[in-house]
Amino acid sequence: LSFNLHRNVVFKNADVPGQPLGYMEYSKPENLWKGLDKYCNEDTNCESLTIPHNSNMSGDMMFRRDKFNVQRTDFTPDYVQLRNKYEPLLELYQHKGGSECQRGGKNGADEFCEFEKFPFNNLIADRFNGFLTGEPGEQSFLRYALAEGLNQENIHGTNPFKYGVVGSTDTHLGTPGLVDEVEYLGHGGAGADNGGGSEVATGLTDLISF
């Protein structure tokens, strides 16, 4: 159902692995971190971190481990240390909605939980008018992760969700400062959403799931 679980991988310098760590070989988050441990380390003068985004559209899977293995293995000391090492940041806001807290969650009314909420829990839903989706659950949001991180620290001695937060546009234009709403070029640069009646450029898309 196209749950959003991918990460941005950011390298400190130009010393990077010889080839990308692709999904076919590293389909689970912890396998990505293990691959970085193997190919991007002190011996290769390489350093990196991963930044997950759109946890609100992860189908309650972003902060779980048992969903990614047949054995339903939960958190272990090695896992929480690995995640703590490679994932110090979380993207909290972008144009696919806020990932801080669930709308109408168990803690009651909170204006921050009503702001910029995307009504789907996966990336494919907007193409089918909400079909194949539901409201994002509590486990898709940062506040859940922060509390669960403290719980795991009590158990394993390390907090896997000790996050700083970032906000971004999530456009695919390579222009992080291009945030003018009047001249908005759209998510993919086609300009379909700028209200000016301009034609959509061939080969570009402005689907929110792009």
Name every feature range the model reports, one short phrase each:
Residues 1-210:
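Extended, charged catalytic domains and RNA/DNA-binding interfaces, predominantly
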